[in-house]
Amino acid sequence: MPTINQLVRKPRKSKTKQSDSPALNRGFNSKKKQFTNLNSPQKRGVCTRVGTMTPKKPNSALRKYARVRLSNNIEVNAYIPGIGHNLQEHSVVLVRGGRVKDLPGVRYHIVRGALDTSGVDGRRQGRSLYGTKKPKN
C-alpha cells in the first residue's frame, strides 16, 4: 500500500480502454503510405474469402463468415448475419463493429442490405438489422 507522499509524487494512472474493433479506428493515407488515427462507425471492404466456421464448445453450427480486406488495407473476419446470403469473393461489403461471442477471431459484422450485400429474403420481424424492405400486402 503506497504512502500519501508516494501518491502525491506519482498519482495512480487510470486504465486506458482498448477498442473492441481496432480496425475501424485506423485510416490509411495511400499518398504517404502510412496509417492515421481515424475513427469510423463502418468501413467498406472487399471479400477475399467466404466460408463457414464452427463455434466454440457448447454450441454446434456452421456459422457463415467472410474474410474482408478493408479500405485501410487491414484484413478482418466478419460475420454474415441472417439466413442465406449472396456474398462471394470480390463482393464489396460494409463492415461494422460487434463481435460474435462463440466464434474466436470474429470481431466485426457485415451490414445486410448495403453495397453488394442483399437483405434477408422473407423476413417480416426485425427487418431493420437485416436490410429487408417492408413487404407489400
From Swiss-Prot:
The modification 3-methylthioaspartic acid is found at D102. GO terms for cellular component: small ribosomal subunit. PROSITE patterns: RIBOSOMAL_S12. It holds the Pfam family Ribosom_S12_S23. InterPro entries: NA-bd_OB-fold, Ribosomal_uS12, Ribosomal_uS12_bac. One of its GO terms (biological process) is translation. Keywords: Methylation, Ribonucleoprotein, Ribosomal protein, RNA-binding, rRNA-binding, tRNA-binding. Residues 1-55, 118-137 are annotated as: Disordered. Part of the 30S ribosomal subunit. Contacts proteins S8 and S17. May interact with IF1 in the 30S initiation complex. Belongs to the universal ribosomal protein uS12 family. With S4 and S5 plays an important role in translational accuracy. Interacts with and stabilizes bases of the 16S rRNA that are involved in tRNA selection in the A site and with the mRNA backbone. Located at the interface of the 30S and 50S subunits, it traverses the body of the 30S subunit contacting proteins on the other side and probably holding the rRNA structure together. The combined cluster of proteins S8, S12 and S17 appears to hold together the shoulder and platform of the 30S subunit. NCBIfam families: rpsL_bact. This is Small ribosomal subunit protein uS12.
